[in-house]
Amino acid sequence: MSDIQLNTLKPAEGSKHAKRRVGRGIGSGLGKTAGRGHKGQKSRSGGFHKVGFEGGQMPLQRRLPKRGFTPLGQHLYAEVRLSELQLMEAEEIDVQALKAAGVVGQSVRYAKVIKSGELSRKVVLRGITATAGARAAIEAAGGSLA
């Protein structure tokens, strides 16, 4: 085993490079202009564009909209599954009953029943529409749409 001790540790030969000392005379090869060339914006101190600057073209972060939008009627309509009607205790169901049971949100005005799940009991829907498949399932269970 080699003679490695904490006080003799050093990096491998050639693995570390000395820091570039620019502007310290012509003998260094990086004197005078210090690797910046002659004149121009990039040769000046502080001479760099801001982040996102695209040369005067409208930058990406200003071309894109700040945020999307919410359709005004989005929360007025709700879909109700047959399986949700099955769990409700009331026989006559309207939008108010759906709100009271927590099936739809409080801002909902119109509801539509879709054929998803099973319905095995009689329900009467008032002021609620239904898809053709849901209507058939409700009527097959002895219910109706009023």
From Swiss-Prot:
Skewed-composition ranges (Gly residues): 24-34
Keywords: Ribonucleoprotein, Ribosomal protein, RNA-binding, rRNA-binding
Membrane spanning residue stretches: none
Keyword RNA-binding found: yes
GO molecular function: rRNA binding; structural constituent of ribosome
Family matches, as InterPro entries: Ribosomal_uL15, Ribosomal_uL15/eL18, Ribosomal_uL15/eL18_sf, Ribosomal_uL15_bac-type
Region (Disordered): 1-56
Pfam families: Ribosomal_L27A
This protein's record includes keyword Protein biosynthesis: no
GO cellular component, one term: cytosolic large ribosomal subunit
Stored SUPFAM superfamilies: Ribosomal proteins L15p and L18e (SSF52080)
Any one GO BP annotation for this protein: translation
NCBIfam families registered for this protein in UniProt: rplO_bact
Chain's role: Binds to the 23S rRNA.
Subunit structure: Part of the 50S ribosomal subunit.
Recorded family membership: Belongs to the universal ribosomal protein uL15 family.
Record protein name field: Large ribosomal subunit protein uL15
